[in-house]
């Protein structure tokens, strides 16, 4: 029981401190929305975009073996005799 109360107390103190102290002190975030939901949505959009742009360097013989976000299957210097999926 005592450990549960301690955890609750520490959590509540940390939540209060997180609201008191500013997150950005450089002034860059002055024009950003402070709504946490919109920040989460923005973060998820950035992750989705970066995932779309990622092309894994899988071993391949033809372009058809590569994922849709890769443009070609070609020899890449330093990867040995195998072809790799690449994004140009």
From Swiss-Prot:
Q: Which cysteines are joined by disulfide bonds?
A: 55-70, 60-73, 66-85
Say yes or no: keyword NAD present: no
Could you cite one Gene Ontology molecular function of this protein? ion channel regulator activity
Give the free-text PTM comment from the record.
Answer: Contains 3 disulfide bonds.
Which terms are listed as keywords in the entry?
A: Cleavage on pair of basic residues, Disulfide bond, Ion channel impairing toxin, Neurotoxin, Secreted, Signal, Toxin
- Write out the domain note: The cysteine framework is IX (C-C-C-C-C-C).
What is this protein's function per UniProt? Acts as a neurotoxin by inhibiting an ion channel.
Q: Which family does it belong to?
A: Belongs to the conopeptide P-like superfamily.
**The name this protein goes by in its record:** Turripeptide Lol142
């Amino acid at each position: 029981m005592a450990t549960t109360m301690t955890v609750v107390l520490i959590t509540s103190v940390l939540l209060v401190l997180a609201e008191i102290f500013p997150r950005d002190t450089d002034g860059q975030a002055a024009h950003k929305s402070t709504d946490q939901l919109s920040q989460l949505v923005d973060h998820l959009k950035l992750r989705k975009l970066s995932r779309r742009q990622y092309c894994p360097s899988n071993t391949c013989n033809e372009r058809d073996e590569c994922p849709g976000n890769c443009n070609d299957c070609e020899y890449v210097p330093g990867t040995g005799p195998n072809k790799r999926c690449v994004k140009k």
